[in-house]
C-alpha cells in the first residue's frame, strides 16, 4: 500500500544518506 511505499522510499533515502 501507500504506507509501504513511503517506508521503502524512506529506507532508500536513509541508505543513501549513510553512503554520503
Curated annotation (Swiss-Prot):
PTM Leucine amide: list the residues: 20
Membrane-spanning segments: none
| Record keywords, A-Z | Amidation, Amphibian defense peptide, Antibiotic, Antimicrobial, Immunity, Innate immunity, Secreted
Q: What is its main location?
A: secreted
- Return the GO cellular component terms, semicolon-separated: extracellular region
- Output the superkingdom of the source species: Eukaryota
Subcellular location as annotated: Secreted
Question: Tissue-wise, where is it found?
Answer: Expressed by the skin glands.
GO BP, one example? Answer: defense response to bacterium
Which family is annotated? Belongs to the frog skin active peptide (FSAP) family. Dermaseptin subfamily.
* Functional summary from the UniProt entry: Antimicrobial peptide with moderate activity against both Gram-positive and Gram-negative bacteria, and important activity against Leishmania species (L.amazonensis and L.infantum). Acts on both Leishmania promastigote and amastigote forms. Shows activity against E.coli (MIC=17.8 uM), S.aureus (MIC=32.3 uM) and the phytopathogenic bacterium Xanthomonas axonopodis (MIC=2 uM). Shows low cytotoxicity against mammalian cells in models of peritoneal macrophages.
Q: This protein is called what?
A: Dermaseptin-N1
Organism annotation: Pithecopus nordestinus
